[in-house]
Amino acid sequence: MKATYHGHSVVHIETNGYHIWIDPFLNGNKHTDIKPQDVKADVILLTHGHGDHIGDTIEIAKNNDALVIAPFELATYLGWQGVKTHPLSIGGGREFEFGKVKLTQAFHGSAIIDEDAKTITYTGMPSGILFTAEGKTIYHAGDTALFSDMKLIGELNHIELAFLPIGDNFTMGPDDARIAAEWLRAKQVVPVHYSTFPPIEQDPHAFADSLHGGVGHVLNSGQSIEI
């Protein structure tokens, strides 16, 4: 299984011939190396409804006839936009032909904000994602704050690779993400959700170097990890 980082919180997983994308925010993502029209996707996994995580989901899903798996309310909203969806709720998981997807809790907001119309559409509880295929598990934490049940997630799951936000301001900062990495017991940790916008400027190398056991890895956009 291969996981490729594409800037901000965008992750592309390749497993058994399937292309699975998490939070494909590409247009407006200054760090990405790929355009929505160039994406090949079978499945899109969404952590929550903010624009920098939904991103180009609708375009990519329609271009590829891809399945979108998201928290219930967000999946319902996207279904109204003509997208093929499967809803999950926090704590719920499901086996698909490409792997198992389970949503964990996450602590932050989730809404679609229309600046022009001055409207905010509630999109349900935000989530983290546990994705398991080929006997290995990847955890994507979304935009979460640090929370103590990360210890339980680490105890119940053998996490090969964790993508943790470090940007601070809107998510965990590096100090809390360092604690999260210890609690999750992940074999490899990649920092995400940093330096895309001025309020979340961080040094990912300093964070990665601070993790015990050499588990931290900084990926530039387009770089991959094999697990």
Swiss-Prot record:
Q: Return one GO MF term.
A: hydrolase activity
Which residue ranges traverse the bilayer?
Answer: none
Similarity comment: family membership: Belongs to the UPF0173 family.
Which SMART domains does this entry report, sorted A to Z? Lactamase_B
Arranged from A to Z, the UniProt key words for this protein are: Hydrolase
**Which positions are tagged coiled coil?**
none
Origin, by domain of life?
Bacteria
Write down the InterPro entries for this protein, in alphabetical order. Metallo-B-lactamas, RibonucZ/Hydroxyglut_hydro, UPF0173
Its name, as the record gives it, is UPF0173 metal-dependent hydrolase BPUM_2573
